[in-house]
Amino acid sequence: AMEGPTPVSALIHAATMVTAGLYLIAKLSFLFILAPFTLTIIAALGTVTALLGATVALTQTDIKKVLAYSTVSQLGYMFLAMGVGAFGAGIFHVLTHAFFKALLFLGAGAVIHALHHEQDMRRMGGLRQRLPWTYATMLIGTLAISGIPLFSGFFSKDEILWSAYSSPFGSPVLWLFGFLTAGLTSFYMFRMIYLTFHGAFQGAHAESIHEPPMSMVLPLIVLAVLAVFGGF
């Protein structure tokens, strides 16, 4: 997914290819409910995966790698939901995650296209005036994945965290690590937005930067609408 074009990355990270195991657990939930210890292992592994993916994303400078490790973290969130018996919440997060993660990858592709294949965020900056549609839609995706209220990610993440705390299979410890991961997610995503779109431009060929054609912008707008309303 990392080496392919961003539309391929968007499809792979947003579609069921990376969530096949999650879907399997959901379909066999009637069996997993009978094995509480197995659910505990799933919840623990999901929590560790979510936290580890988020901490690695904090250190990345490649815009696509930030989103790739973000997917790892969000998959951990989904498995946390499965492990505490919140199978519906886990599948709900698959849906909302598909909207905002596809949006973010396609937005990253628009940025890379505008900068002549540059992916290092340290060589970006100040792009919000030159790429206003890309900036606005990626900001919406960032608000959604960060779990800001009324965006789609808020509803699914809130359900997962509540289940981690209140479910018979959950615990305050799982909730705490899930909450910490949510904070880290917000931090590294807004870090990406700041390095890419704010401050001064750090790259070359500033005069040639322009908004991608409408054929690239329109999917961003559609996905941005879904990232806002997909949780209702």
What are the language-model segments listed below?
Residues 1-215, 226-232:
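Hydrophobic transmembrane alpha-helices and their helix-loop junctions in integral membrane proteins
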